[in-house]
Amino acid sequence: MLTEQFDPSTFYSPKTVAIAGLILGCVLIYVYNDYPTNVNVPVIGVGVRYTKWLAAVRNVFYARDSVAEGYKKANFAFQIPTLNRMEIFICDRKMTREYQNLDSDRMSLDAVVVEEFEFDLLSPGHGHGHRRGPDSVPIPVVAKALAWQRRRTANTNDPFFQEFMAEVSYGFQQEVQRLSQDPRSSTTTPVFTVPCFSFALQVVGRITTFALFGRPMCRDRAFLDLCGKYSDGLPRGAMLLRPWPKWMRPFIAKHMEAPQVLAKLKEIIGAEIERRKASDGESPMENIMDYFVDWAYKGRDTVPADADDTVAHVLANLIFASFHTTSQLLTDCLFEIAMRPEYVEPLREEIKDCFEKHGRETRAVLDSLFKMDSFIKETHRWNPLDASALARIAMQDFTFSNGLHIPKGSFIFTPNAPIFQDERHYSNPKIFDGFRFAKMRDDPKLKLTCDLATVGEYSLNFGLGRHACPGRYLASDEVKLSLIHLLQNFDITVDPSELPLKRVRYGKFSLADMSAKVSLRRLRSEVKG
């Protein structure tokens, strides 16, 4: 089931620790004693003067600390050891600009994604970065599809945005009814507790699949469960595969969940593609799947034989890319609201004022919620998912203008989380200020940098430049609409026993505790829509 999500805390069970120890032993034997340092920048970590393995093992769970240490100590760059490789971090902004927008045949983001998530083994098929086939859906087409859908939300003559809002309301009503049902009767309880992450994942899953596929697929419980299993199984499988030698990974991957779930997903999506092709353009484009089908088949003299499989695979990868990242952001927002009740009334007042000014079902409402947008962006600053950003693999040797040489195959990043705690870029960075970015809008020099979806050199959660996340606007809309519904209909609290809230670390990542819960108390009358 979708709610049966992977809990990283299972890594700490005795059985798992023993297995991890065995894996680590195999890795150490496999690589013998050490691996070389090929880039002339400082190495950060415990005992790195003598061996990199102590620091590499520590970085399995504390890589974020190493990145923060390197950011403080390094002049322009540093590197940290991991179990698989050295990772190079570029701190100098001039150097960052030199590599961030290079073509993929020189510095590839796609290659990093393929490597990090073991796509060749766990998601075999089309559209994988530097291995992208000639008939795959290009990334610019994906970006254009998402931009097309965003333009529809601003068109007052297009019903899409109203339907989008209605689906948010419907999704919440379904999940709340399920979670608040009294098992001893058919009634619902006014106060109920929910596992925050799984609740957020359910709602985000419904909204995202509406944007990608439309109805009725976004309301099909079996399909939603498959989407959840795939988005969960892919990163989990990659974490379990990564410590093993590469020659062993194909044998292990055969027994993992992600490839099997992907096959089922593609079968369902493929059948829907065939149904839509059969309409022969009689129905207008309504969602991202329609856009891709139109792109793949309309106006072409020759259609590739595997076009259906290509479109299905790209849609499956969009499910993976959107489900967990947006769910994590919504989860963090719910926890911050629950722990900081002083923000609730100002946010509710802003929602009320914007509804009165712009109407209930207009794009202008979302674009005018400056305090809410600020609260979400501050939550993102306070709880960055990844300590790094701008990840690339050098596809060929590269030399920066200052003479630093990067050999082919090197992994390059820039620090992300430490920037948000840097007083040079954020005033009072150790203090959570939910309306920080709303107040910045009064400054003509800063107001264009304040939106949640705006990227910049000191706001890298969504990337930067030509490779910035094209789905960030959809994620922003989904989180805002979710918070509007929750704030209008519920008081959100957290039990003191849950505090302080734990975060689960793995490598450079920090995630909300997936087992932590919040309590929802219904307000007097639930607002529909």
UniProtKB/Swiss-Prot annotation:
Keywords: Heme, Iron, Membrane, Metal-binding, Monooxygenase, Oxidoreductase, Transmembrane, Transmembrane helix. Its cofactor is heme. Its main location: membrane. InterPro entries: Cyt_P450, Cyt_P450_CS, Cyt_P450_E_grp-I, Cyt_P450_sf. One of its GO terms (molecular function) is iron ion binding. Its EC number is 1.-.-.-. GO terms for cellular component: membrane. The chain crosses the membrane at residues 11-31. GO terms for biological process: secondary metabolic process. It comes from the Eukaryota. Heme binds at C469. It is a single-pass membrane protein. Pfam families: p450. Pathway: Secondary metabolite biosynthesis. This is Cytochrome P450 monooxygenase idtQ. It comes from Claviceps paspali.
